[in-house]
Regions:
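Phosphate-handling catalytic cores of nucleic-acid transaction enzymes
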Residues: 1-275
Length: 275
């Protein structure tokens, strides 16, 4: 038996498989977050926390500070890192990340800091006054077990997710829907800028993007009920108007919350002619 005589090449060692996580922790490092996004691909990741303080604590660590990734991921812009410990550079061309957070007014102001940062306009907000009326905690037939309720919805959504991964959808919008979208957000932008804060402009523009994303999600749900293997599906007027109505409400909440934030932590000096 003849054996090849050569020195071992350690570069030929098998590559360790990367685990793919759909739900990731808000308590993570910047490099670890990029790894998660790279492994997840187009499926993406979801980061959820019921306390904004968790995000504040994580971003305050030296290994954290991934605020720029949150901003880029909102528009699926490329994120990357290149450290010696990682070996090859890690590049995520189109990161997909959903972020859901909740907290108090004080936590909100600490996390977003100012309107100039850009993180604020990338979020959809919903706020409400605290209900000071006591609600009965006694068990009864009318009480809904929220844990079981959302678990059942989660199972339904998981089945939908697995099937639709094999049947991607191209969502289309009619010319009349695009026209309405232009008219609606042009008017919203005009009204927002009347207040004299330029930062409101980015909020409205990104709300326009969010509105179409929401309409696309509704269309995929509609496709699931109708013909789940269709390659192309047009957004119905009902779903489009529903998405626009929701966005109108979210914009009002965003504008309300924006009044509690400064335009910038350190206002830049006014520009003037150099010569």
């Amino acid at each position: 038996e003849r054996r090849e005589k050569r020195l071992p090449d350690i570069n030929l060692k098998p590559e360790e498989p990367k685990a793919q996580y759909l739900k990731i922790s808000a308590t993570t490092s910047k490099s670890r977050l990029i790894e998660h996004l790279a492994a997840a691909g187009e499926v993406g990741c979801c980061m959820t926390t019921t306390e904004i303080n968790t995000m504040i604590s994580s971003l305050g660590q030296d290994c954290g500070k991934y605020e720029d990734i949150l901003c880029k991921a909102a528009h699926h812009e490329e994120v990357s890192s290149s450290y010696k410990i990682d070996g090859e550079p890690i590049v995520v061309q189109h990161p997909h990340l959903a972020l859901n957070i909740a907290g108090t007014q004080e936590q909100f102001c600490v996390f977003f800091r100012s309107l100039e940062v850009g993180l604020f306009s990338r979020f959809a907000f919903y706020t409400r006054q605290q209900n000071q009326q006591w609600e009965s905690c006694a068990p009864g037939d009318e009480q809904v077990d929220l844990r079981r309720y959302f678990q059942s919805l989660g199972k339904e959504l998981l089945e939908m997710h697995k099937v639709l991964l094999e049947s991607p959808t191209q969502v289309t919008f009619s010319l009349s829907q695009w026209k309405l979208h232009t008219e609606l957000f042009s008017e919203m932008l005009r009204r927002a800028l009347v207040e004299g804060r330029d930062s409101s402009g980015s909020l409205i523009r990104r709300a326009g993007l969010l509105g179409m994303r929401l309409a696309a999600v509704f269309t995929v749900f509609r496709k699931w009920e109708d013909y789940r293997y269709a390659k192309e599906y047009g957004c119905t007027d009902e779903d489009f108007h529903t998405a626009m109505d929701i966005i109108r409400t979210l914009v009002e909440h965003s504008l309300l919350l924006s009044t509690s934030l400064p335009d910038a932590n350190q206002p830049p000096a006014s520009m003037h002619r150099f010569h």
